[in-house]
């Protein structure tokens, strides 16, 4: 039997519970050790208990008191940006080599988008999964960056209001800041901007993302091929990720440049990418692709890290 590394998930809300179910069903190098929350009445903790997973409603302090804490190699943090800072400090003092996968916008460690830079971060002890909008759109920015220098990238993430729990709503400002920084840091844009829209439509619509990229002039066929290749790579761990329609291109001539705040007047090739992300519906409804892409990316990251650790 293949050895598996034990994980704890901190946060028993939508994301934490969905991630638990993914690990229970599909974990190859990982297995559940504990689900941690702060609300003893949460559905996530009740579900974990029914599935035979150890639980605590006393936060990371309760996790540290569980009999199996010594066997935990990975901790996924699905709380909030502020809570992650405290959780990281507490857990790191107890287990310096613990691997933390941060699903909040705290970004203590380097940003990680699996198809873009996972291999460079395999030995990090804390990686940040950016945001749902970042996981969906940064691969597209990086795909253009492989072909041409990207001056500016702007993303708009539209998610169903019903899929946005209290953690998501509390982190709106951090969402835009973290996503914008990651568009630059790993997407390759000189300047990035992120916008999130909570769509109140009923019945809820699946996650939709729009990516606008202004780059140096480039061969359109090469850009389109790079985008299609990247989308296929993301589908390797998020099957519901897809290009909604063909990529659109617009030439921005020198005579009529765009005025980008912070960069000035720029010309080049404008690339518009339209995406949708349908969730796998493990715990959350299919419209909650925004949450599914976060849990799927986090699981893909930890699985690859665990594989590397087990093969060392």
From Swiss-Prot:
- Output the SUPFAM superfamilies linked to this UniProt entry: Glyceraldehyde-3-phosphate dehydrogenase-like, C-terminal domain (SSF55347), NAD(P)-binding Rossmann-fold domains (SSF51735)
Check the record and name the Pfam families matching this protein.
Answer: AcetDehyd-dimer, Semialdhyde_dh
Q: Per its record, how is this protein called by name?
A: Acetaldehyde dehydrogenase 4
Give the EC number(s) under which this enzyme is classified.
1.2.1.10
HAMAP family per UniProt: Ac_ald_DH_ac (MF_01657)
Q: Does the keyword Magnesium apply?
A: no
Q: Which GO terms describe its biological process?
A: catabolic process
Instruction: Name the reaction it catalyses.
Output: acetaldehyde + NAD(+) + CoA = acetyl-CoA + NADH + H(+)
What is the enzyme's main class? oxidoreductase
Q: Gene3D superfamilies in the record, alphabetically?
A: Dihydrodipicolinate Reductase, domain 2, NAD(P)-binding Rossmann-like Domain
Q: Which UniProt keywords apply?
A: Aromatic hydrocarbons catabolism, NAD, Oxidoreductase
Active site per the UniProt annotation:
132 (acyl-thioester intermediate)
MF annotations from Gene Ontology: acetaldehyde dehydrogenase (acetylating) activity; NAD binding
Checking InterPro entries in the record gives: Acetaldehyde_dehydrogenase (IPR003361), Acetylaldehyde_DH_C (IPR015426), NAD(P)-bd_dom_sf (IPR036291), Semialdehyde_DH_NAD-bd (IPR000534)
Q: Give the protein family.
A: Belongs to the acetaldehyde dehydrogenase family.
- Residues that hold NAD(+) according to the record: 12-15, 163-171, 290
Question: What is the superkingdom listed in this entry's lineage?
Answer: Bacteria
């Amino acid at each position: 039997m293949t050895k598996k590394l034990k994980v704890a998930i901190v946060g028993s809300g939508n994301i934490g519970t969905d991630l638990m179910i993914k690990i229970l069903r599909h974990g190859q190098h990982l297995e559940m050790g504990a689900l941690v929350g702060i609300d003893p009445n949460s559905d996530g903790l009740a579900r974990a208990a029914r599935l035979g997973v150890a639980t605590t409603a006393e936060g990371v302090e309760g996790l540290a008191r569980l009999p199996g804490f010594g066997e935990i190699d990975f901790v996924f943090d699905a709380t909030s940006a502020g809570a992650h800072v405290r959780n990281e400090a507490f857990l790191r003092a107890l287990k310096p080599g613990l691997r933390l996968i941060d699903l909040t916008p705290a970004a203590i460690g380097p940003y990680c988008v699996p198809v873009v830079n996972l291999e460079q971060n395999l030995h990090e002890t804390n990686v940040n999964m950016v945001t749902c909008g970042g996981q969906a759109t940064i691969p597209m920015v990086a795909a253009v960056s492989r072909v041409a220098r990207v001056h500016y990238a702007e993303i708009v993430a539209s998610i169903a209001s019903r899929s946005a729990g209290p953690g998501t709503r509390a982190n709106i400002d951090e969402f835009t800041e973290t996503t914008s920084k990651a568009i630059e840091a790993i997407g390759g844009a000189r300047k990035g901007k992120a916008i999130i829209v909570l769509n109140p439509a009923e019945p809820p619509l699946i996650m939709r993302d729009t990516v606008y990229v202004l780059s140096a002039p480039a061969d359109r066929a090469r850009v389109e091929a790079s985008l299609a290749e990247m989308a296929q790579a993301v589908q390797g761990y998020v099957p519901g990720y897809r290009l909604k329609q063909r990529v659109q291109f617009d030439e921005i001539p020198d005579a009529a440049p765009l005025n980008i705040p912070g960069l000035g007047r720029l010309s080049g090739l404008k690339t518009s990418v339209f995406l949708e992300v349908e969730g796998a519906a493990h715990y959350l409804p299919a419209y909650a692709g925004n949450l599914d892409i976060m849990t799927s990316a986090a699981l893909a990251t930890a699985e690859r890290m665990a594989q590397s650790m087990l093969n060392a």
